[in-house]
Amino acid sequence: MNAANRRKSTSTVGITGRKDATRMKIEQMEKERKERRKTMMQRKEARKQEHMKNIEAGNPGDVDFIGLVEEWRREQENKIGDKSPPSLFASTNSNICIAVRKRPISDKERQKLDHDSVSCFQNKVWIHSAKLKVDGITKYLTHNSFQLDHTFGEDSTTEQIYLATTLPLVDHVVSTQGRATVFCYGQTGSGKTYTMNGIQQILAYDLYGQLAEHTDDLEITVAFFELYSGNVLDLLHGCQRCKLLEDGNGEVNITGLREVPAPTPEAFLQVIEEGHSLRTTQKTEANDASSRSHAICQVFLRDYGGNLRGKLGLVDLAGSERGSDTKQHNSQRRTESADINTSLLALKECIRALGQKSAHVPYRGSKLTLILKDCFSPDSKTTMVATVSPGASAADHSLNTLRYADRIKEQRVSSNGQRGKAAKASNREIMPSKERLMRIAAATEQADDQHSAFVQKMLAEHDQVQADANDYAFTEQVDEEEADDEEGDYEEESEDLDYEDSEGQDYEEAVESQYDHSQEAQEGEEELRRTVQAVFELEEALLNQHMSNIQANAEMLTQEGKLLQSVQAGGLSEDEMHNYAIQLAEFLDKKESLIYKLQSKLDEFQEQLAREQELARQVQLTQY
């Protein structure tokens, strides 16, 4: 009996001990859970404060990605340390200068919670692309860098850009009677037209000042026209259509284009303003007032005999677009986009050939490069200012813009064949005189005031910048992370490795499917681009044939009138009536032939247009 009681007592003590251990483990788990919740609330509060701080700084968006970008920038600043900043002045030995300008974050981007994803340091520009790992939670950044001649951040002034990119071109045109061209290139809405307007504002006073110092026997005339869907339109004379012709000597002439005298800087700016007011713009996905044409301002320096003594081109290129961005457009918008991208591709090849000092420059690739043929001569100078949008949603567009500029820059560097100290020794900088700097500073006062107002408008904090939407998005994001953390607490010890394997396999299959889908979409877009280009060419042929028919009919109408008058006189012999019938039959045959040619062109155009619309529908379905 005593032995039984002892066994029962021992068993009771063992059970009690196990209960105490279980209770202690539960209490420990509860304590850890409270600690996690406390830490989570602290992190939530810290993220909220960081989110509000970013909004006040004019940079809303994902707190984690913004933090990663800022951390990366601090590391870069530490690496740079006390290194001297790059010079703002251009070198004299290069025929090609490539620069990039980053604009400030816009109100529209703030409302979309779009954070700043572009950084500029020491003539290099980085694009930070936000990514998620396979788990769909862990965030990280990828960095794409590009080394260019000059990089300008959102705080750069128009004066700095002018000194680095355009000032040496003015010296080249005035001193050597040469040719020079400034291009502004980039995604629609990235600030091309704004940058070009600032350059023109300063150029107006700097060019006239340099001419006054060097010579007094030259006068300035200006031609301002746009290239829209393959048509040359004179912006200074009611958008009259001009013809692009090439004579037997290879000289390109724009018939019907008139030059306007500009005796003073004020007259020059008035001409520029008039031209900009008539430029073709349309609404696109990226910009409500996107420039859909290449605006070309040509400044001619002529002596009093009319002989050309220098030429400077200011080209504001149309906004570049990818094929997938035009899937919702009608045929006219798609034709515009195809023509824009074709001309930009041809322009890149011409500038590369110029940088390589190639014997052949493919300027016949588009009407844009054909117009600028004389600017691609070996002794000409070219500057390209690539503009990029800082928003994360535009990262792909910014990458394409910088790759375009980098291809040109890469070819120029390799063609020079100079590296290290040898290259630096030949890069003699252009240092303008004190009087010229003062003149430029005075000229930029108005432009800089506009720039400052623009920056303040873009960077100022608004009381109602989608505050409710921001708070909702932030709370939703934090709640999702909290739910993920809690789910991880309860499931971290019961994860199944087979499930992970199957998840990885599903992910790989999804990636492969997405790749195949992307390849199919790219092929469809390429076919659509070729078809749109064919539609554009057939449209041009149809219009030319129609015009030829009208002219031929007018000539025949005059001849028919004379023939009819000769018959109506009366007293005609049988032979004369027979000749009348023969000539009338010839007129009818000619008219029938003209109608047949025009009808054939029309049928071919309509057939190709129907094919273009069908391909556009297929590409749209492929995108989704």
From Swiss-Prot:
Coiled coil stretches, renumbered: 426-624
An example molecular function term from Gene Ontology annotations: ATP binding
Localization (cell): Cytoplasm, Cytoskeleton
Presence of keyword Nucleotide-binding: yes
A GO BP annotation: microtubule depolymerization
Gene Ontology cellular component annotations, sorted alphabetically: cytoplasm; microtubule
Residues covered by region (Globular): 1-85
Record-linked Gene3D superfamilies: Kinesin motor domain
Pfam families per the UniProt record, alphabetical: Kinesin
Biased composition (Basic and acidic residues): 17-33, 42-54
Acidic residues compositional bias, start-end: 478-511
Alphabetically ordered keywords of this record: ATP-binding, Coiled coil, Cytoplasm, Cytoskeleton, Microtubule, Motor protein, Nucleotide-binding
Disordered: annotated segments: 1-59, 478-528
Residues in Kinesin motor domain copies: 95-411
SUPFAM superfamilies to which the protein is assigned, alphabetical: P-loop containing nucleoside triphosphate hydrolases (SSF52540)
Primary location: cytoplasm
Binding site for ATP: 186-193
Entry function: Involved in anaphase spindle elongation.
Similarity comment text for this entry: Belongs to the TRAFAC class myosin-kinesin ATPase superfamily. Kinesin family. MCAK/KIF2 subfamily.
Protein name from the UniProt record: Diatom spindle kinesin-1
Gene from which the chain derives: DSK1
